[in-house]
Design a protein with these regions (language model features):
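Peripheral interaction segments used for macromolecular assembly
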Residues: 1-250
Length: 250
């Protein structure tokens, strides 16, 4: 089922022996457009802190009661490694937390051993790096952060550029709540298209300038403007998704 990230904020996380806390934000992998962690703000049953939980621990999502059940106890969460979620999560921290919960690594061969085309404008593994890319990668490695783990909260508000100009800002994300992959970005167009909201797929992203907070897609303003109308009050079904893909000839 397709669901927006914003609709999941505030959901109660229910452990095997009681409530753990509330959903605050999500971290996604910008190479595969997959949710890697949900950030949970714990409740009053122990000193308040924020923790990361992987979809590996998810058991049941109940949209009626707005609860997400996980296969973890309160005690397990309480004793989890401390992670400063307001700072970039390092690879070492990921290894620590995944080891603590016995979650497998991702990307197939270890965390980063999977070849292919990334969703956000570059290959999964830089086979041929430019000098600038090499310097950036080494700098990020020295800073100990995972350069491909992004916060949905951080990316919300990024400018969306087409091949011929700006069309709006990222407002939300549409995910599949089974695979936990991001299928679409919701774009608030403001005055560009008379306030119309449009959705774009990560597959259409040509380039991302993270420092400038700009996402560029490989379609024109006119193409986006005339795309099948998106109704935010209705869930995205297969019929709409097919019509959208047919329109963009993807």
């Amino acid at each position: 089922m397709k669901q927006s990230i914003n609709s999941l904020l505030g959901y109660t996380i229910k452990g095997t022996d009681g409530e753990i806390g509330k959903v605050e934000e999500f971290f996604f992998d910008d190479q595969t457009s997959t949710i890697r962690y949900v950030v949970i703000k714990t409740g009053g049953w122990f000193s308040e802190k924020k923790v990361l939980i992987s979809p590996e621990a998810f058991q049941k999502l109940d949209c009626e009661s707005k609860k997400l059940s996980v296969n973890l106890t309160q005690e397990k969460i309480k004793n989890s490694p401390d992670i400063e979620t307001d700072k970039p999560v390092s690879e070492q921290q990921e290894e620590l937390i995944r080891g603590y919960y016995s979650w497998p690594g991702y990307y197939g061969n270890g965390m980063y051993g999977h070849m292919g085309l990334g969703m956000w404008g570059y290959p999964l593994v830089e086979v041929r790096e430019t000098e600038k890319e090499m310097i950036q990668r080494k700098t990020e490695k020295q800073a100990n952060k995972n350069p491909h783990l992004r916060s949905t909260q951080e990316v919300t508000g990024y400018d969306i550029h087409t091949t011929d100009g700006n069309i709006g800002k990222v407002e939300d994300f549409i995910i599949d709540n089974v695979s936990w992959k991001i299928h679409f970005l919701i774009v608030e167009t403001g005055n560009w298209f008379s306030g119309k909201k449009v959705i774009i797929s990560p597959r259409w992203i040509k380039d991302v300038k993270w420092q400038e907070q700009i996402v560029t897609i490989n379609h024109s303003k006119e193409e986006v403007k005339n795309s099948p109308e998106y109704d935010s009050s209705q869930p995205i079904n297969d019929s709409y998704e097919h019509s959208l893909n047919d329109y963009y000839k993807k």
